[in-house]
Amino acid sequence: MAGRLRGPAVPGGGESSDSDEDGWDIGYTERPDKLKDSLLSEEKDEVLKRALTTGDGSLLEELLNSGMQVDSSFRFGWTPLMYAASIANVDLVRILLDRGANASFSKDQHTVLMAACSARVPEERILKTAELLLSRNASPNATCRKRMSPLMYAAREGHSQLVALLVGHGAEINAQDDNGYTALAWAARHGHKTTVLKLLELGADKTLQTQDGKTPAEIAKRNKHPELFSMLSLTLNPLHGKFQNITKEENICKFLITDSEKSRDHGFSSYSAFGDLEIFLHGLQLEHLTELLKERDITLRQLLTLRKDDFTKIGITNVRDQKKIMDAVEELQVEEIKFEELPEVMKLEFSGDEFLNFLLKLSKQCGHLTTAVQDIISQFPVHSHKIVLEWGSPECFTSVCEDLVHNAQNLGEEVGKLKHLIQKLHNDQKNDSCRIPPMENVSTGKKRLWKRAAVTVCGFGLLFIVCKLTFLRK
């Protein structure tokens, strides 16, 4: 029986008779040869947990045959179906559903389908479980207390085929939770490239913002996923709505059957992974160039540095394809500071706006440089066997890195000096008795004097009229 244990040890299992809590033991306990009708309710609960833990379908059926209610709940509210779904045991789920278990059951708005979508098991098992639950009318649009849907749980875990299955059964792809996160935002936050691509293919809106005003691209950047940031920042929405007009059956078939056939030779993953180059080309609807670029061993970084003449040399002759790539590269390029446009000498007429603009550009450039280094770090080969071409001596690279660190420190020191000078200038201006006040202050003082004079004149005029009327009456 020990050989029938499946998956990680999560809710379900044997409990000692001395336990006051409704806890779960993970160890193996011997199964009785035959269940007795006289078993107490507590004993049946213990045997039921054992059946769920070990994945023992025959023991579960014996319990149900002995009179145990299929939707009986444990002390903390979960039903057997909820436990079976949480470990994505499709055999147990099928037995319980066939016996009348409620596929739409929820505890504190957490549904059975949500439990399956967040299971810590291989995606293939989750797919089978979710498909079975959906066939028994489990709602793909139910939300938990935080308004998260099963689709958001699937996207958060990076299950791309599960995402396709849920959307194929009517899940709202652009629904938002309490924080304004969509399924796309959740996938971007956790760096799931394949899931992001799948959601974009299915029509996810990458312009929707969270409650704090962040788009999926900005979320990816904040969580240090530069490739996703680049892809989501493109003007075009990659393959937007490409599969929105096909039927539910065609949708499910398209994203489940074909992908599973491709991955038969790969034991653990049921979906194929996409590299940076593939994602970039998908984003521009240029998938047909993938094989061409791979044959010529052109990486994404090399592609981003090509010029118009280079495209023709490598076989990209279509003008529209060339323009798409160049427009995308132009959009992703770092804005360079044109130092030659700055005044050579600091003159008195050098405006504060120009100086502020220089500082803002300098700060932006430093931010871009930091992002570029983070990008290199995230893709740097950790193991030497992953390096295809022979590299030079590491001392050469470390020496340049030391120069970079030294230059960065010098930049920090110089900026600190500049800040000190600005503060000193500000203090000198405040303490200078001969300083001419700004025109705004002068004009404001004159306006006040004119207002006072006008009020005084009006007051004297009103007093004169009152006195004259009083004199005439007498």
From Swiss-Prot:
Its main location: cytoplasm. One of its GO terms (biological process) is transposable element silencing. The modification Phosphoserine is found at S16, S17, S19. Keywords: ANK repeat, Cytoplasm, Developmental protein, Differentiation, Meiosis, Phosphoprotein, Repeat, RNA-mediated gene silencing, Spermatogenesis. Residues 270-333 form the SAM domain. The keyword Flavoprotein does not apply. ANK repeats lie at residues 43-72, 76-105, 108-142, 146-175, 179-208, 212-241. It comes from the Eukaryota. The keyword Nucleotide-binding does not apply. Disulfide bonds: none annotated. One of its GO terms (cellular component) is pi-body. Residues 1-31 are annotated as: Disordered. SMART domains: ANK, SAM. SUPFAM superfamilies: Ankyrin repeat (SSF48403), SAM/Pointed domain (SSF47769). It is found in: Cytoplasm. Plays a central role during spermatogenesis by repressing transposable elements and preventing their mobilization, which is essential for the germline integrity. Acts via the piRNA metabolic process, which mediates the repression of transposable elements during meiosis by forming complexes composed of piRNAs and Piwi proteins and governs the methylation and subsequent repression of transposons. Its association with pi-bodies suggests a participation in the primary piRNAs metabolic process. Interacts with DDX4, PIWIL1, RANBP9 and TDRD1. This is Ankyrin repeat, SAM and basic leucine zipper domain-containing protein 1. It comes from Ornithorhynchus anatinus.
